[in-house]
């Protein structure tokens, strides 16, 4: 299978070589519309997500603008970006990896303040539901959610709204 790939054997090894067979199954899965990875702390969920993003970009020909990753902290977003750069290089700079709040502020088209932060995710979800967001801003083929178990009602509503607008969107939740 490696012969057909548009990446070097060394890059292929970097993406798949350090992973367990279960982790490789997740990264190799090109069919499932929904993937949920449930595992304990320290089990490699973050690694799986980063390697899955690398696989999407390099092996499945998903374009960077088709990817959206949502997380709960800027620190997590920064760490993901750093790890992705290590695997795929400069293309990682163009992958949208944001917190739920920063993504929501982007969608509603304004800078965020602490007072507004409480309601911004709900407001963004409402705007998507009412089709008040430019479709190109939310057209994604893959949504990756870090720490999905921490989603509150508003976060989940935002994810549902995105899924309704992108019926073919694959969702990977950890």
Give residue ranges: language-model regions:
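Hydrophobic helix-cap positions at the C-terminus of alpha-helices
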Residues: 56, 87, 131, 162-165
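Conserved catalytic network of the ASCE P-loop NTPase/AAA+ motor domain
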Residues: 60-62, 135-137, 164-167
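The start of beta-strands in P-loop NTPase/AAA+ ATPase cores
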Residues: 33, 94, 140-142, 171
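P-loop NTPase Walker
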Residues: 1-113, 153
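Conserved helicase motor core of SF1/SF2 NTP-dependent helicases
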Residues: 41-46, 51, 74, 142, ...
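Short C-terminal domain-edge/linker segments immediately following a structured domain
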Residues: 99-102, 126-130, 174
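Conserved RecA-like ASCE ATPase "motif II neighborhood" in helicase/translocase motors
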Residues: 108-140, 147, 151-161
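Glycine-rich loops and low-complexity Gly/Arg-rich segments
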Residues: 63, 93-96, 120-124, 167-170
